Amino acid sequence: MSYNIRIGIGMDQQTNLKRIAEVINKIQPDYVGLQEVDSVCERSGWINQYAELARLTGMYPIFAPATERSKGLYGIAALSRKKPRSYQYIPLPGKEEPRTFLCLEYPNYTLCNTHFSLDPDSRLASIRLINETMKSENKPILITGDFNMEPDSKEFKAMKQTWRLLSDPTLETYPSDHPRLRLDYIFGDLA
């Protein structure tokens, strides 16, 4: 599952992590890649959002900071039913703000999460970095994320040269209240 939580702000402009946890608990995924997550930031009430969501869902949390924001950290996270053997995150380019790629390693597979830049050149550079980082993996890989790219973009086509699209290619995901763009996907390796 991929979920851009928008620092906990719902469509009613109210911050409510319990609602986000309710969505996750209703679906009961084994893994959730979270984007736009605050960690102890003033703007989100000094709450460690990924830890609170882990508490509310009973899942294991991992956070990958992208940048400092509002006297805290901002980035992406993952929630998993199983504790990973290890994890790593690497910085990705972002013209408007730094971005991150997070991978959780398990004995038989690797689960990754990302949030790509709004800038097409930064997205292409991110794809190259991800491909270079993951080329030595010898087990199945799943990448969730807010990729900020539509299916007809050259970045999407570049991603599909190395990765297989696993999510519904017709599912419009943005904006939440009246989705008309496809920006969020789940990819797997071609092996």
Regions of interest found by a model, annotated:
Residues 7-9, 88-92, 113-120:
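Surface-exposed cleft-lining segments at the edges of enzyme active sites
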Residues 1, 80-85, 97-113:
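Beta-strand-turn-beta hairpins that frame and shape the catalytic cleft
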Residues 18-23, 52, 103, 128-133, ...:
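Alpha-helical elements of Rossmann-like donor-binding domains used by nucleotide-donor carbohydrate transfer enzymes
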Residues 105-112, 124-147, 154-157:
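His/acidic metal-ligating clusters that form di-metal
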Residues 1-56, 68-70:
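N-terminal, active-site-proximal structural segment of metallo-dependent hydrolase catalytic domains
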Residues 30-31, 140-142, 185:
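Short, Asp-centered acidic motifs that coordinate Mg2+ and/or phosphate
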Residues 3-5, 37, 114-116, 145-147:
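Active-site metal-binding loops of divalent metal-dependent hydrolases
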Residues 13, 45-46, 59-78, 97, ...:
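Active site of divalent-metal-dependent phosphoester/diester hydrolases
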